[in-house]
Amino acid sequence: PDEGSRERALDNYNLTLLPIDELYNQPKHSFEVIALWHVLEHVHDLSAYMNAFKSLLKVNGRLIIAVPNHCSYDAQFYKNYWAAYDLPRHLYHFSPSSMDKLCALNNMKVLQYKPMWFDSFYVSLLSEKYKNAGFFGIVRAFFIGCISNFKALKNPKRASSIIYEIKMLDAAL
């Protein structure tokens, strides 16, 4: 986070957040879990980050990545109004197949796909706001969120946002 955000975290919550450069200064194989909650879609150098994660994870460590899924029902419904496209802040847009490919390129494998159930409602509400849909939009957002989640019940790869549990393949160690 930027300096102002780090100061607010310290002042308001007594949390010390480090500049992103510190990621590259951590000892190798020092983390059992690295978690990114709606972060990866914002990074400028995806390859450098993936390499850093590989070097920081311990043997059998896990990388947990949560990102929006542009192949979800709500993304298909809202099309250009889908709030999780969030341009220009989202530099990347992921789907289960693109995450699988990213992992394969980095000698990693997705172990699990888990839906983020509430994201479908939040993203649908924002999408309706972008459409200036008014009160009816709030009602429609609820139903679109429900439909999106129903589809994710059958297939987690259809969720509005997905939590990926990722491990390195042995050859990467």
Give residue spans per PLM region.
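Short glycine/proline- and charge-enriched loop/turn segments
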Residues: 78-87, 125-133
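Short hydrophobic/aromatic-enriched beta-strand-loop microsegments
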Residues: 17-19, 84-85, 113
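Residue-level signal for beta-strand positions within conserved beta-sheet cores that form or flank
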Residues: 13, 87, 109
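Conserved SAM-binding loop
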Residues: 1-78, 93-105, 161-173
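Short secondary-structure boundary/capping segments
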Residues: 7, 83, 154-155
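A SAM-dependent methyltransferase catalytic signature shared across enzymes that methylate proteins
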Residues: 96-114, 140-143
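Conserved glycine-rich, hydrophobic/aromatic-active-site segments
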Residues: 90
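A C-terminal cap/extension of S-adenosyl-L-methionine-dependent methyltransferases
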Residues: 112-173
